[in-house]
Amino acid sequence: MLFFSRTTRWVLAPLADRLDQPDQACTPLSSNNPLLRRILTGVEQLLQERSALKEQARALTQEVTQLDERVACRDALLRQWEARWALVSHGAGELFWELEVNGTAAPSLACAMRWTGSASILAPGIDQLGHWNEQLHPADRQRHLDTLARHLADRSGRTPFVLDVRIQPPSGDDYRWCRISGDSRRDAQGLPVAMGGSLRDIHQQHLQDEVLELAATRFDISREMLHDGLWDIEVVAGDPANPKNTIWWSSQMRR
């Protein structure tokens, strides 16, 4: 059994109280006994370190709370912008795409592609450049890759990427004409780091252009068969004598 002197007990009792309530302010303990003095000094240092750590933990907790609030605000803002983008892309009648180019002018057919929008001309699962290229008409596939490579290889960024291609719909129906266009973001050396664009169905417009071109060809043939000359005038501001009026003459009028 260990026995303590009265002096030792006189020191240990307040030390026990100090350890029971370490955060309560009190006068530092002291003793004439060298061993007790070392113990009291060590305990006081540990309590001070504990207090400092608690203060640091309190500050870190407050900082984490502030960061959580900022992250929550950013998440709310992100969801808001995502909802706006979904609304815009859904109402645009176009598909929007992103291509991972990885800083190369000749992207691999395995490069990832992401699509957003509501158009139904694209088959599901088109998540790579190669899969997308396979959906094009065989006569358009290499032309599509060549146009893409020329755009990415031009470090000045002046070569556009705009191309009319034929796409086979998921239903397996006849190919439809679509226009794919895009642009790339480049680093300081002009190497592409990101690329994106849109895909728009222009099939009806293409058919109308063909009809218009056929009508123009027929008109030219009919005009050449006539012996009478034809002419028309574009009247500016309703003034037949306006010198800015444009007059067109058929070839018979020039003979």
From Swiss-Prot:
Question: What transmembrane ranges does the database entry give?
Answer: none
State the disulfide connectivity: none
User: What Gene3D superfamilies does its record include?
Assistant: PAS domain (3.30.450.20)
InterPro entries xref list:
PAC (IPR001610), PAS (IPR000014), PAS-like_dom_sf (IPR035965), PAS_fold_3 (IPR013655)
Q: Which domain of life is it from?
A: Bacteria
Q: Fetch the CDD domains from UniProt.
A: PAS
In its UniProt entry, what is this protein called?
A: Uncharacterized protein in P47K 3'region
Q: Which organism is it from?
A: Pseudomonas chlororaphis
